[in-house]
């Protein structure tokens, strides 16, 4: 049953956009996929939680996290088969773990935590908070951006993840990301 949270084996390079809300992750995911002529994995939580908001006017609750994790991994595993040498992921289960802990007083479902730590990626692109925050139905922490960024960065450091921090405008971020991804592709 827990297999639905596990990555399928693959030889392609996997890159994750990682960071607080409204820091340009989706925009950069799309740009990188276009640049590398590959597919990108959207953030399943956005669709899931937008539907919940539209239907019930409710935001994320703890019982939503495992269905979100399952949907995210289903998308990633499906799109891995369609990717060409690199897969760009708008998020991963480690990000879901961070949000779980940030919103639910340090709590994270043990199943989510297990797979957040077991699933592997070649590079994390940590997006900084120097992009203006944009409101939508799901974003709710404009006053806590510095704290959230520190939490995301601390999580990558705690678990020894390979990451770089992206700051600046869209062009600068894209160029830095491409530079680091190319280094991995050329190894």
Which ranges hold each PLM region?
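Extreme N-terminal, non-catalytic leader segments
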Residues: 1-13
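Hydrophobic anchor at the beta1->P-loop junction of P-loop NTPases
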Residues: 17
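The conserved Walker
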Residues: 21
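Conserved lysine of the Walker
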Residues: 25
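Short amphipathic alpha-helices and their capping/turn segments at secondary-structure boundaries
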Residues: 29-35, 65-84, 108-121
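Conserved substrate/cofactor phosphate-moiety recognition/catalytic segment
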Residues: 30, 34-71
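Conserved nucleotide-sensing/catalytic segment adjacent to the nucleotide-binding pocket
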Residues: 56-93, 98, 102-103
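A glycine- and Lys/Arg-enriched "phosphate-lid" helix/loop adjacent to the NTP-binding pocket
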Residues: 103-169
